[in-house]
Amino acid sequence: MNLEVIAQLTVLALIVASGPLVIALLAARKGNL
């Protein structure tokens, strides 16, 4: 595999994983408040 392909896959994985994480953090902050 090329480094470019690996880089694109890692970026996509981070974006997909960051979605639910951001929602969870916002929900946790609202819950704490």
UniProtKB/Swiss-Prot annotation:
GO CC terms of this entry: chloroplast thylakoid membrane; photosystem II
Record Pfam families: PSII_Ycf12
Keywords: Chloroplast, Membrane, Photosynthesis, Photosystem II, Plastid, Thylakoid, Transmembrane, Transmembrane helix
Transmembrane segments: 5-25
InterPro entries, sorted: PSII_Ycf12_core-subunit
Compartment(s): Plastid, Chloroplast thylakoid membrane
Membrane topology per record: Single-pass membrane protein
Superkingdom per UniProt: Eukaryota
GO biological process, any: photosynthesis
Subunit structure: PSII is composed of 1 copy each of membrane proteins PsbA, PsbB, PsbC, PsbD, PsbE, PsbF, PsbH, PsbI, PsbJ, PsbK, PsbL, PsbM, PsbT, PsbX, PsbY, PsbZ, Psb30/Ycf12, peripheral proteins of the oxygen-evolving complex and a large number of cofactors. It forms dimeric complexes.
Family, per entry: Belongs to the Psb30/Ycf12 family.
Biological function: A core subunit of photosystem II (PSII), probably helps stabilize the reaction center.
Name of the protein: Photosystem II reaction center protein Psb30
Organism this protein belongs to: Marchantia polymorpha (Common liverwort)
Gene giving rise to this polypeptide: psb30
